[in-house]
């Protein structure tokens, strides 16, 4: 190693051009640009300690942050580590750093930058105008004295945005960690020498932070005292929005005098304060020289937006020990929020700290000042053993983790990690300490290619050889990502570096326009449909108005602290919020005056929610803020945790327990249900589930080298098999069901979008195709999935406006349904029939309350009119129609407990009684002799009508007529028997009486659990007169589009259903006789050419791309509109349109009957309406879906019940996608396949079925039953067992999680958050989204990644209306601060907005992209309250 300089960026190449990718100042063999960092490698342990340095650390704690451009963010970071070249002690005392504690030491042999993270970064001296980049710390340092940087230089644009006097001054230095800024301006507090001075004043041998400047010319200014005791210290700040803050500083002498005065005036003479206890001066410490100057308070002195409404108290206040150590922090309400204790022998060495309302964490150090133990009185404690290149961390559960390191000081990195279970992972780094490779516990290696200068990742190669490539512009902004499947996403930026367009993998582009040249906030966004949204911002960067693509506006109001106080939507919907003096939300009130109130404990945990009717929901917490019990309506659930914070026991409302056990890596290995059912789990070295045991069932899981599941076995027998194409896209899933080979096949276009799904059932012995059902999907030029072609039906086309709001529906080009919408895009008028939209025979008008609830649905025919009444809590309490009124009563927990039906000469009240856990009980009013009060295991053994038996899996196996006591038994009771497959799916049902079967049925399923067929044998009289089961079964086939049943085919007819988009509410019913369908059967052009294209008669197989071209050509030929593009490729093949047209088989249009489903507010069909407006069928139901009466003069087959359910006449059950629902009990007959993720009672259907539905049989409930459900693709039934889905990018992982979470977030109006983790394979997965203790705000970094994986990103939602200091539709300032904090080690932060956008920030707090990718409020639900 020579120690000679490497290339500088001002040097010339042999061709005469400047080196723009060199690393100026980086000496070969010298440590320039390397930090003595607080957190080398970003590693922390426990609460928290940096084991690599043996330092107690506290990453940034923010005390003050008001929104605005270049805001004044006052935060503190602490480290007990002592650098060898420390800066002077800052205003928070020894060990602490503030954002302004940036100091550049100017030495003859080099420069030392002491930053606010505690790092000391060494650089070689710089000439005027010269720039240097620290690769290990990702930081630029530039000396002034140059008007411009060379073209193509990474900092050229950012440098040009600086005022000329700053750029041209050789006495100023500037630092930044991003080519997009901001700059930290390093100057001095003394007077700048003027031109008239004969001899300039000597400059100090250091530079301090005097301000900040961003790429738009905005500045934040620090005012430093020029003379006196406070010379050089910051006493005032003007932020980028013009706010002015005063920083009150005190000297050690002033604090000593105050302490003496306070002691003399104190009545407690037993503790006189001696002079030595509080000295007037402070000696130097291991943390640097100490002048004793401390920050005691910060006041807001001027606010341009609120000049007459300034706070009467400081925004934050601090107190100190006699040694000048930070003792306590007080918020703007003068509440103590933090407390600290230090070692009396080592000033500044923290030995304990505490948050308000939380226990005290304590620390012990060795003689060298390294932490050897952290003591947690209410959780895990840790011990640290330091050896040469090796640190051993042992927790209080005696789990040991060994870190093997290489390198020194700021380049120390963990290269080998021995985990608590004995597995080992390895990491590789380049010379700058940047990660280049990871090897997982199974020995599989993931490699990261880096730009040698910037450190940006240029490619990732996973162990299976698949590669993802990343491209950047001169400003190090990501411009393109090419995924392993070859699809590419792109981004474009304007001159200041603002995102102007973002093109997704599937080709949709969103564009951004900026009206203000000095702002990064867009004025408009235009999505792929051409729809434009407008935003108006305050001077503080807060959204004041949002105007959607239809010109409809939402307005926002804020208080002086930036907290949102009101939201005003169209149609008169408003929400108002109030906060306490600590900034916590205390109430939310709607436009009708209905108020929900919130209470908190000292730690800030939400302890009570009081609804408008006065009901309280209370939550109690343990010492660390984990909920230990929730009580609502007198019913309590409780949770118990172990020292590691893992849930080990749940106690439900009945007092029953569910228990959990974990392995050394915190993975669940055993759980016992409330009923004693035991399940166990085993994992491989990389954490993938390989074996699960469920009582007597043993399931083995197998994966390919890309960690994709390939097949499973159950008790040694083959089960499901998965197949993927070269892109990695799932193409086939198959298995055997009841002796039949059942498969699902997927097709995609060249952009990776699903174009078709085909289900097949074959005889495995003969290969005979017994059933095939295919659904095709098409997309318009804007990328909207607006066209679906059901099997054997003409295309269904959705007519939309704006960004996809539904305006109408066509079937085969014929308009059937039209919609009119209000200014919130809610449906107000729906018309159906051949005259839809003009004088339609069916016209449904909907109105809404001022709070946004459905108020009425009136038809031009009065028979189905309905009016809805709501309580202050938002409970549906009344439905009134022409014939009757139903009134509903609820418990304090929101359960439906009674229904009263009122009509002329009719007044009936039906009660519904449940035990505390929600299991149905005989109602005391109807069964006063019943002694049942609780079902401890949630398994109902009997009711007024039946006796039930369950097996070890909790599945209902037998149901027998109940013979009341005292009644003579005649042995004529009927017994129902239920049999299941290894996936707990009902496969055989029989009903027996007098020992003879009355009916038998068998059911087939596809690998996703969707029912493909049922066969029913009924008891009938044969030719000899004997009664026996029929020899030939009644066969019904089923076809699916995603999770929605779209086709039901019997021996005589086929019924097909079109649903409302994104919903389980049926819209159109099309019935076709089988004979008519057979007449219409024909080959497609592609099929004809493939079958007749070979001389040997065996046919040929065309590539998928050719099949797509021929399918498109066939459509064009039939429409007599052949495109020039099609003619061109035909000509290239030497063919003409006429030749191909002769091969197109003629079409026969079968006779079809179309009806509209007229549904209730939940999506339950009440009537079938013909195109001429007549009612072909109608029925009435109770609240749990039981049919009370039916008018069916035409013998119409209508099996649909509550959304997602189909009635089976043979058993009386409703098939509900993943389970079977018993409407008589209002619950399922088997346990939830999602386990506790679906709710604590695994049998439970929503206990308020009037407002909540479960279309998937998984207890994923939606408050607005008509509006939304996860309909596309494979539902995550297996997620609890096989682990989370994994992706090639953090964005894909976050998007998947947000799509799953958004519906719940919007309907519950709660913020949810989670993190994205990276496994040792380089794959990304998201944690489950959670909300914090029912708060409106959610902090993602409370979540932890599984042991052995790394936290790399975070995501969150904003609910429907934010209840805190942020704007619904964009990242808040605190969000940006979170992702900018290097201590969090986040690569990106993601957000799902109420408007349906997916937004992303990089780790510099800059927008990466905004695109419409998640469900929005208008398509999901508009909640009435929080």
Swiss-Prot record:
Stored InterPro entries: DUF4329, DUF6531, RHS, Rhs_assc_core, RHS_domain, RHS_repeat, T6SS_VgrG/RHS, YD
GO BP: any one term: cellular response to sulfur starvation
Basic and acidic residues bias spans: 1073-1085
Region (28 X approximate tandem repeats): 320-1197
Annotated S-S bridges: none
Sequence repeat copies, ranges: 334-356, 357-378, 379-421, 422-442, 443-464, 465-485, 486-506, 507-529, 530-550, 551-571, 572-592, 593-613, 614-633, 634-654, 655-675, 676-695, 696-715, 716-738, 739-762, 812-832, 833-861, 862-882, 883-905, 906-941, 942-970, 971-995, 996-1030, 1173-1197
Biased composition (Low complexity): 262-277
The entry's keywords: Repeat
Induction: Repressed by H-NS, induced by LeuO. Part of the rhsD-ybbC operon.
Region (Disordered): 256-285, 1073-1097
Similarity section: Belongs to the RHS family.
Protein function: Rhs elements have a nonessential function. They may play an important role in the natural ecology of the cell.
Entry domain remark: Each rhs appears to consist of a highly conserved 141 kDa amino fragment followed by a highly divergent C-terminus.
PANTHER family: PROTEIN RHSA-RELATED, PTHR32305
Protein name: Protein RhsD
Organism: Escherichia coli (strain K12)
């Amino acid at each position: 190693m020579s120690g000679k300089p490497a290339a500088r960026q001002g040097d010339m190449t042999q061709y005469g051009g400047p080196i723009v990718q060199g690393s100026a100042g980086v000496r070969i063999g010298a440590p320039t640009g390397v930090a003595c960092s607080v957190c080398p490698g970003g590693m922390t342990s426990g609460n928290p300690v940096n084991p690599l340095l043996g330092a107690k650390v506290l990453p940034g704690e923010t005390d003050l942050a008001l929104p605005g451009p270049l805001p004044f963010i006052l935060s503190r970071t602490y480290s007990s580590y002592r650098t060898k070249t420390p800066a002077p002690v800052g205003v928070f005392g020894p060990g602490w750093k503030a954002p302004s504690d940036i100091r550049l030491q100017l030495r003859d042999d080099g420069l030392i930058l002491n930053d606010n993270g505690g790092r000391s970064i060494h650089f070689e001296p710089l000439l005027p105008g010269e720039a240097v980049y620290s690769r290990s710390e990702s930081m630029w340092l530039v000396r002034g004295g140059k008007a411009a940087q060379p073209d193509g230089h990474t900092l050229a644009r950012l440098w040009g945005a600086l005022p000329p006097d700053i750029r041209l001054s050789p006495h100023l230095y500037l630092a930044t960690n991003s080519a997009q800024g901001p700059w930290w301006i390093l100057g001095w507090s003394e007077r700048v020498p003027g031109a008239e001075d004969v001899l300039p004043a000597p400059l100090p041998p250091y530079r301090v932070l005097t301000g900040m400047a961003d790429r738009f010319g905005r500045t934040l200014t620090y005012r430093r005292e020029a003379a006196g005791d406070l010379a050089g210290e910051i006493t005032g700040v003007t932020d980028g929005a013009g706010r002015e803050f005063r920083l009150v500083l005190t000297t050690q002498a002033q604090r000593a005098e105050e302490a003496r005065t306070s002691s003399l005036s104190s009545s407690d003479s037993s503790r006189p304060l001696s002079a030595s206890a509080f000295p007037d001066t402070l000696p130097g410490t291991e943390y640097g020289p100490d002048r004793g100057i401390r920050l005691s308070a910060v006041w807001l002195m001027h606010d341009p937006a609120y000049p007459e409404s300034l706070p009467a108290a400081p925004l934050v206040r601090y107190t100190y020990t006699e040694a000048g150590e930070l003792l306590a922090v007080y918020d703007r309400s003068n509440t103590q929020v933090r407390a600290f204790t230090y070692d009396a022998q080592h000033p500044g060495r923290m030995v304990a700290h505490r948050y308000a309302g939380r226990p005290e964490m304590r620390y012990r150090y060795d003689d060298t000042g390294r932490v050897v133990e952290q003591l947690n009185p209410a959780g895990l404690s840790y011990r640290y053993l330091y050896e040469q290149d090796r640190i051993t961390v042992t927790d209080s559960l005696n789990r040991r983790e060994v870190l093997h390191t290489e390198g020194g000081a700021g380049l120390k990195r963990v290269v080998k990690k021995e985990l608590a279970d004995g597995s080992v992972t390895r990491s590789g780094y380049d010379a700058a300490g940047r990660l280049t490779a990871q090897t997982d516990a199974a020995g599989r290696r993931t490699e990261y290619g880096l730009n040698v200068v910037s450190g940006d990742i240029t490619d990732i190669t996973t162990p299976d050889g698949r590669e993802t490539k990343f491209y950047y512009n001169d400003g190090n902004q990501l411009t393109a990502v090419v995924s392993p499947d070859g699809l590419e996403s792109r981004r474009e930026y304007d001159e200041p570096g603002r995102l102007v367009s973002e093109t997704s993998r599937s080709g949709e582009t969103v564009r951004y326009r900026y009206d203000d040249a000095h702002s990064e906030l867009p004025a408009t966004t235009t999505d792929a449909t051409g729809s434009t949204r407008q935003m108006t911002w305050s001077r503080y960067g807060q959204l004041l108005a949002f105007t959607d693509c239809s010109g409809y506006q939402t307005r926002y109001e804020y208080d002086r602290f930036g907290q949102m106080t009101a939201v005003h939507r169209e149609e008169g919907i408003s929400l108002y919020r109030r906060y306490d003096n600590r900034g916590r939300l205390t109430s939310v009130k709607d436009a009708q005056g209905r108020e929900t109130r919130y209470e908190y404990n000292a730690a800030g945990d939400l302890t009570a929610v009081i609804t408008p009717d006065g009901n309280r929901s209370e939550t109690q917490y343990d010492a660390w803020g984990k909920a230990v019990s929730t009580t609502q309506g007198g019913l309590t659930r409780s949770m118990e945790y172990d020292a590691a914070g893992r849930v080990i026991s749940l106690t439900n409302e009945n007092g029953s327990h569910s228990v959990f056990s974990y392995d050394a890596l915190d993975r669940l290995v055993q759980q016992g249900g409330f009923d004693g059912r035991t399940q166990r789990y085993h994992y491989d070295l990389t954490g993938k589930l390989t074996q699960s045991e469920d009582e007597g069932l043993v399931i083995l899981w197998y994966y390919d080298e890309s960690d994709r599941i390939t097949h499973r076995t159950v008790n040694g027998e083959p089960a499901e098999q998965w197949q993927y194409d070269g892109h990695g896209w799932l193409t086939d899933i198959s298995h055997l069901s009841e002796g039949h080979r059942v498969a699902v096949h997927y097709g995609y276009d060249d952009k990776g979008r699903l174009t078709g799904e085909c289900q097949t059932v074959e005889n495995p012995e003969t290969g005979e195709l017994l059933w095939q059902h295919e659904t095709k999907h098409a997309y318009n030029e804007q990328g909207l999935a607006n066209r679906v072609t059901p099997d054997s039906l003409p295309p269904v086309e959705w007519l939309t406006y704006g960004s996809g709001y539904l305006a109408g529906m066509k079937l085969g080009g014929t308009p059937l349904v039209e919609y009119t919408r209000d200014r919130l895009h809610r449906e107000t008028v729906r018309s159906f029939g051949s005259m839809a939209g003009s004088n339609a025979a069916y016209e449904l008008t909907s109105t809404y309350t001022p709070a946004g609830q459905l108020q009425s649905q009136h038809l031009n025919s009065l028979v189905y009119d309905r009016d809805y009444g709501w309580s202050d809590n938002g409970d549906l309490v009344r439905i009134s129609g022409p014939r009757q009124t139903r009134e509903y009563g609820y418990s304090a927990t929101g359960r439906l407990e009674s229904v009263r039906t009122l009509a002329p000469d009719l007044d009936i009240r039906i009660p519904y009684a449940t035990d505390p856990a929600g299991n149905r009980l005989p109602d005391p009013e109807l069964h006063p002799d019943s002694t049942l009060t609780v079902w401890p295991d949630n398994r109902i053994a009997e009711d007024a009508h039946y006796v039930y038996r369950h097996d070890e899996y909790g599945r209902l196996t037998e149901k027998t007529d109940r013979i009341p006591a005292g009644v003579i038994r005649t042995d004529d009771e009927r017994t129902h028997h239920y049999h299941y497959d290894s996936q707990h799916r009902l496969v055989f049902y029989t009903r027996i009486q007098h020992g003879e079967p009355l009916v038998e049925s068998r059911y087939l399923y596809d690998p996703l659990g969707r029912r493909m067929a049922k066969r029913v044998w009924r008891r009938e009289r044969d030719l000899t007169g004997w009664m026996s089961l029929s020899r030939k079964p009644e066969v019904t086939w089923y076809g699916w589009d995603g999770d929605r049943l779209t086709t039901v085919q019997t021996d005589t007819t086929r019924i097909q259903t079109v649903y409302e988009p994104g919903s389980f509410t049926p819209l159109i019913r099309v019935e076709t006789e089988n004979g008519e369908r057979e007449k219409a059967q024909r080959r497609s052009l592609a099929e004809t050419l493939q079958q007749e294209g070979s001389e040997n008669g065996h046919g040929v197989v065309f590539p998928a791309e050719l099949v797509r071209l021929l399918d498109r050509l066939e459509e064009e030929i039939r429409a007599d509109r052949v495109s020039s593009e099609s003619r061109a490729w035909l000509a290239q093949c030497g063919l003409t349109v006429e030749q191909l047209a002769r091969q197109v088989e003629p079409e026969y249009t079968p006779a079809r009957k179309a009806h509209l489903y007229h549904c209730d507010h939940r999506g339950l069909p009440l009537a079938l309406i013909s195109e001429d407006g007549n009612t072909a069928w109608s029925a009435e139901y109770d609240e749990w879906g039981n049919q009370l009466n039916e008018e069916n003069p035409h013998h119409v087959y209508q099996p649909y019940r509550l959304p997602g359910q189909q009635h089976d006449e043979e058993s009386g059950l409703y098939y509900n996608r993943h389970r079977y629902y018993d409407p008589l009990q209002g619950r399922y007959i088997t346990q939830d396949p999602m386990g506790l993720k679906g709710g604590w009672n695994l049998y439970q259907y929503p206990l308020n079925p009037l407002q909540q539905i479960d279309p998937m049989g998984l207890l994923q409930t939606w408050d607005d039953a008509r509006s939304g459900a996860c309909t596309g693709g494979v539902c995550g039934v297996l997620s609890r067992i096989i682990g989370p889905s994994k992706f090639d990018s953090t964005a894909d992982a976050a998007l998947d999680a947000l799509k799953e979470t958004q519906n719940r977030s919007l309907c519950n109006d709660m913020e949810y958050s989670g993190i994205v983790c990276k496994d040792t394979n380089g794959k990304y997965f998201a944690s489950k989204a959670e909300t914090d203790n029912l708060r409106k705000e959610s902090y993602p970094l409370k979540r932890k990644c599984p042991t052995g994986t790394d936290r790399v990103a975070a995501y969150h939602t904003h609910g429907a209306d934010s209840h805190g200091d942020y704007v619904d539709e964009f990242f808040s300032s605190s969000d940006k601060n979170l992702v900018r904090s290097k201590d969090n080690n986040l690569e990106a932060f993601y957000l799902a907005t109420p408007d349906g956008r997916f937004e992303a920030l990089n780790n510099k707090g800059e927008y990466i992209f905004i695109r419409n990718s998640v469900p929005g409020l208008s398509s999901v639900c508009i909640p009435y309250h929080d």
